[in-house]
Amino acid sequence: MTDGYYGGTSPSVGNVDGDNGAPYADGYSDTLADVAMEYYENDLASGLDDLVPTTDTDTATHQHMVTYSVSFGVYGTLNPDDYDIENGPYPTWPNPGSGDQQKIDDLWHAAVNGRGTFLSASRPDDLVNSLLSIMQHIESRIASASAVSVNGDELYEKLGADILMFQASYNSDGWTGDVKAYGIDTETGQVITTSYQWSAADELETTNWDTGRIIATYTGSAGIPFRYSSLTSTQQNQLNADPTTAQNILNFLRGDASNEESNGGPFRDRYWRLGDLVHSSPVFVNGVLYTGGNDGMLHAFSASDGSELFAYVPNLVFENLSQLADTEYTHKYYVDLTPTVKYVSSLDKTILVGGLAKGGRGYYALDVSNATSITSETALAGKVLWEYGGDDDLGYTFSKPVIVESYDSSVGAIVIFGNGYSSVNENAVLYILNPWTGAVIKKIDTGVGSCNGLSSPVAVDVDYDQIVDYVYAGDLKGNMWKFDLTASSSGSWDVAYKSGGTPKPVFQAKGPGGAIQSITTKPDVMRHCEKDGYIVVFATGSYLGETDVSDTSTQTIYGIWDY
């Protein structure tokens, strides 16, 4: 803060901004604007990683000074209202040494070079408001930083001669996402975080939204290219009743920015195309990374360079897709579950099965046996196997599927998952489907309901023959269930323990005072090290809704012996 009429000695920094172009450059040395540029351009803490969050106007990631200036009600020869620092016209900066008013212009110039703001306050209340404005600007930068969150665990995979770490993230300021690949220091074994090898979001931005992307969807009976002319009439109307608007929304979803507000259109602005990746962590199989996004798509990225190989839009999320283009968009979930990708030996196929988590009630499956060879939308459409939804026993599909071989030779491989939460019937139910057709082989209903649902299962192979014997899964009522799949006929698969014909859990988790402790995560199972049976390890707790945030009830980690 100053009256602007500085009279100090020269800072001797030179003409630091002289080579920066408009609106930063001038022809004068040792000005206040030069000082601001000196501490903006140079790393003020070179020993730290360059991870400073960026904004639209400040793209520097190194540690730097941002300059905010407030003059005490005095003005220079330039009127800031006559110029647009971001888009032009730009000011021609005068020589600060030629007069006091020119020094005020230099004060504004310093704020421009330092990517801050310039304010003038002629009264005490103006000064207070100016300081509040600066604080709000700083807080918005901090909020932008805190909005960036890492999704899931770090994924380490060997790619050729190198080991890479893949990490997904999302930014709640604009709801965008990214997957980045980082190298590993061969001497220290540490992740090299100062730079990344590729960014999927960056790669997608350079891809032509129309001709460069391979995207498919599903009609309810077959895969189709994600093109307006290929959609069913129902899908077209779900986008919009007006064909032109529906076509434009589909183009927007593919990545067309021409109809965004900043370009004079009716759709919301996006920082970039790739949507937020909140709960769906990347899965690496055969050089490909698969992850679900809340842009309505499952994405397949090349692990070598981050380019998108293809994307899939489940028909299950179609009814809400148009909301992604709404200028009043509030965040929604779409393809939010980590997919399962497994080579199925009995089919000689690699199958991907994914769910929606908070995005809806349903699962989908793709044949990804030769994912890197899919070069057209028609070819991708032919790899869509099935979608499953519309079942009153099926809730929001939080349960991560398991693909295993079974003892029923007429059935072969199976997909197993819990029914999730908030189903119409509200019981805890185990689903067993055919991985190639999506047909229901068996539903095992525990009979325990009233706002219940079965969480992610774990399959146990007791004799190492690559065939599932038992399945464990918890529910919202704190029950840990065991399912017996050892019979050679799927019709005999059932809950392992019963009393008088009524299914009984292995254990029920209860806290102090008998309060039920929900089980929402997959258990781990290991052999007892000295005796028969298995130790089932799991933790309780729920983080599914707003009430869970403030819930302070006691939760517990259990290890139970099932023998």
Predicted regions and their residues:
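A fold-level detector for beta-propeller and closely related beta-sheet-rich head/sensor domains
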Residues: M1-Y563
